[in-house]
């Protein structure tokens, strides 16, 4: 047996005597085992000790940290070690090694820390494996841990249903019930799928169920959550339900904001209740709130189609005064209805005025609008 091989075996046995040798196939241990095989299989190793590979920085860091974790280490010690790692692979090696030590078991805080480290390092496969371990009961339940899992699952298309599996497990627990953050994450994820009207109705049932369960669990929604519920109803044109939630906001100590009113204005206008939409818009003005661009444009087009042209023009000027620019469809809708109502010359004057107030319009769009008005007037 060569001197080099004896030194390596002595080093390994010393680590074992300290109960520090990891029994799993970590990155660092794999590298060390490779060096053993290269020594035993290469005939030159008996005569050339200089050919033995030096340890990588990852191996050195791993050995340093496991030596710092003295026998009898606690979950707090492991959490500190995990948080100190900038390399998620090294953190996972430490996490797996500590889990195999006699008398120790990871708690929810250790799993939470490791999952966050893996997410930060974009080790999504590691994260999914850890999540399955948690769901299988590898550690006790914890609201922060489960919310972290739900956040990750909601952000990944193929894990969307898994987020609700975790939520249902929280519902069945005695001491880890869903909190406001849980419902915020789930509702936000559902709302991202409200992109088409027929799809909206599919997910609206889930929104209703979450809302009922939130109330039954005694979770008080904030303005952000209530706005998401209002938005869900408004996008499905369930405007009476949206208005009901709007009126309940005061019961929860929440104040409606510009988003609340914008969702309501768009919803009732798309439902055909333009007068009610204008009423919400004026209520916003009284409170000093400014609608977003899409709210403005839906209201302008709805008023124009209802031949309430003076009110539509007034909203256009208010939109421009708030440094927001209508799109070409909105401009065309107003101008077309003006020309159809025999107010063609007024339409030409408005195009000139809008060009002065709208820096985004540009010369090309201005010419397009003027040509459209001339064409409509000739017809």
UniProtKB/Swiss-Prot annotation:
One of its GO terms (cellular component) is mitochondrion. Pfam families: PPR_2. Gene3D superfamilies: Tetratricopeptide repeat domain (1.25.40.10). The keyword Transit peptide applies. Keywords: Mitochondrion, Repeat, Transit peptide. It is found in: Mitochondrion. PPR repeats lie at residues 142-177, 179-221, 222-256, 257-291, 292-326, 327-361. It comes from the Eukaryota. The keyword Repeat applies. Belongs to the PPR family. P subfamily. This is Pentatricopeptide repeat-containing protein At3g25210, mitochondrial.
């Amino acid at each position: 047996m060569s001197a080099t091989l004896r030194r390596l075996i002595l080093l390994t046995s010393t680590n074992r005597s300290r109960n520090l040798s990891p029994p799993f196939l970590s990155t660092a241990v794999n590298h060390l085992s490779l060096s053993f095989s290269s020594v035993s299989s290469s005939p030159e190793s008996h005569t050339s000790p200089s050919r033995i590979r030096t340890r990588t920085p990852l191996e050195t860091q791993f050995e340093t940290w496991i030596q710092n974790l003295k026998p009898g280490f606690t979950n707090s010690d492991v959490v500190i070690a995990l948080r100190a790692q900038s390399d998620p692979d090294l953190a996972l090696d430490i996490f797996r090694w500590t889990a195999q030590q006699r008398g120790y078991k990871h708690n929810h805080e250790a799993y939470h820390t490791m999952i966050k480290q893996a997410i930060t390092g974009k080790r999504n496969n590691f994260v999914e494996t850890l999540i399955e371990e948690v769901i299988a009961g590898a550690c006790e339940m914890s609201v922060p841990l489960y919310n972290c899992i739900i956040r990750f699952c909601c952000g990944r298309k193929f894990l969307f249903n898994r987020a609700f599996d975790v939520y249902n497990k929280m519902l069945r627990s005695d001491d880890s019930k869903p909190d406001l953050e849980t419902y915020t994450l789930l509702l936000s994820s559902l709302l991202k799928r409200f992109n088409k009207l027929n799809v909206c109705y599919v997910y609206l049932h889930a929104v209703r169920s979450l809302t009922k369960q939130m109330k039954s669990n005694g979770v008080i929604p904030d303005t952000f959550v209530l706005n998401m519920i209002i938005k869900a109803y408004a996008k499905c044109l369930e405007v009476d339900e949206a208005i009901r939630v709007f009126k309940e906001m005061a019961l929860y100590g929440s104040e409606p904001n510009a988003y609340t009113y914008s969702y309501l204005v768009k919803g009732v206008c798309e439902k055909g209740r333009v007068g009610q939409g204008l009423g919400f818009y004026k209520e916003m003005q009284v409170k000093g709130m400014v609608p977003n661009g899409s709210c403005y444009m839906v209201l302008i087009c709805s008023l124009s189609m209802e031949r309430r042209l003076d009110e539509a023009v007034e909203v256009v000027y208010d939109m421009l005064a708030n440094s927001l620019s209508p799109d070409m469809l909105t401009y065309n809708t107003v101008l077309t209805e003006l020309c159809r109502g025999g107010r063609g010359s007024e339409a030409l004057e408005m195009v000139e005025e809008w060009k002065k107030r709208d820096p985004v319009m540009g010369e090309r769009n201005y010419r397009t609008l003027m040509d459209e008005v001339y064409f409509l007037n000739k017809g």
